Amino acid sequence: MLSTRFPRPPGDVGHPGSWRGDTEFRVVEGAGPRDAVRDAAGLREGPVLAAFSAAARELEANGVGAITTSCGFLVLLQEALQDAVKVPVVTSSLLLLPALLAREPQVGVLTIDARHLGDAHLRQAGVPPGQLADVMVEGVDPGGEFARAILGNDAAMDLARAGRDVVAAARALRGRAPRLRTVVLECTNMPPYAQAIRDATGFEVLSLADVPALKSWAAEPMIRG
C-alpha cells in the first residue's frame, strides 16, 4: 500500500472489511499518492520499486495467497512485482480491460486523474495497441473533494462530497458514450461509491474485486459499494 492518511470507508482497498478472512496490509514508506499518480514512470526506477518488491517478498514469506496494491496507476509495476514473487500479483483493476475489450466495442475507465492515466498504463495492462482508442477514460474533477483529499493525502475528507465527484465523472462518461455498458474503476478508493454509480448511470461497474485472482477474497462492501 501507498503511505496514506486519508479516510478509507468500507469498500476501499485499505479497509479491512473490504476483504474476506485474514488480510495483511504492508505500507511502502516514502511512496504517497502523488508519487504513484503524477510520477508513475519514476516508480520503475530508483528505491521505490525496490521497496515495493521487498514488501511483496515479505508478504509472500508470510504465506499470503495473492498480493494487490492500493493504486491502479501501479499497473506500471505489474511485471516487475510479479517477477519478484511466485504468488499472483494484481497491481490494478486495469488488468480487466483486455478481456472486456474482447467482448465489448468500448470500455470506460473512471480515474482519479485523467491527465496522467495514459497509453503506457493501458499497454501495461495488456490492451492491444489497436484498441487503445476503445478505452474511454474519464477523471474526477481535479479541484473536487475526492481528488483534493486523496492526492493531497489529507486526513479529512467529506465522503458525501467525494462520492458526488465520482458520480459526476460517471455521468460525464455516460454523456460522452451513451452506448457504453461497462466501466472499470481505476482508483481503489472508488468502490465505496460503486452502487451510486450504477444507480446514476446504469453502468456495469467493475473494480479490483472483479479480477479473477482476487475475487474469492473480496467482501460485500468492495463488491457492491
What is the meaning of each model-derived region?
Residues 47-94, 179-191:
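N-terminal glycine-rich phosphate/adenylate-binding segment common to multiple enzyme folds
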Residues 80-103, 198-216:
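Short, acidic/small-residue loops that bind anionic groups at enzyme active sites
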Residues 54-58, 62, 99, 168-176:
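A generic secondary-structure signal
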Residues 161-179, 192:
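A short, acidic, amphipathic alpha-helical segment used as a generic capping/interface helix at domain edges
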Residues 1-49, 113-157:
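N-terminal glycine-rich anion-binding loop in soluble enzyme alpha/beta folds
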